[in-house]
Amino acid sequence: MLSYCLLVTGPAYGTQQASSALQFAQALLAEGHRLKSVFFYREGVLNANQLTSPANDEFDLVRAWQLLGETHQVALNVCVAAALRRGVTDAQQAAQLNLAGANLQPGFVLSGLGELAQSVLTCDRVIQF
């Protein structure tokens, strides 16, 4: 059994990166491997935007990530710098920066690149999407 960490750099919609990462995560968990964390970076931080509202007949990727994190105790880390540049923030950052409100999906956590570095050091495999 291997431990994996995923790096997601694609948005929830518009490319296949995030949906491929989710399918890969589900497959490796089904095979008995351990998914320690998912780090959302660059456009990937948009996977943590709770204001994303897909059409009724579309797959809700943001909520699917949230469910995966809750069900399998997977850390869903979001790069704080990349998130703030793209309008994704939690209540603490919103208050510090005098922003109108927070929109980070529950289950996701703003974190720094140190979290990614730690994952690279502690996981058997790091896969980028």
UniProtKB/Swiss-Prot annotation:
Keywords: Cytoplasm, Transferase, tRNA processing. GO terms for biological process: tRNA wobble position uridine thiolation. The active site is at 79 (cysteine persulfide intermediate). It is found in: Cytoplasm. It holds the Pfam family DsrE. The keyword Cytoplasm applies. It is an enzyme of class 2 (transferase). InterPro entries: DsrEFH-like, Sulphur_relay_DsrE/F-like, Sulphur_relay_TusD/DsrE. Its main location: cytoplasm. It comes from the Bacteria. The keyword Cell membrane does not apply. Heterohexamer, formed by a dimer of trimers. The hexameric TusBCD complex contains 2 copies each of TusB, TusC and TusD. The TusBCD complex interacts with TusE. Part of a sulfur-relay system required for 2-thiolation of 5-methylaminomethyl-2-thiouridine (mnm(5)s(2)U) at tRNA wobble positions. Accepts sulfur from TusA and transfers it in turn to TusE. Belongs to the DsrE/TusD family. This is Sulfurtransferase TusD. It comes from Pectobacterium carotovorum subsp. carotovorum (strain PC1).
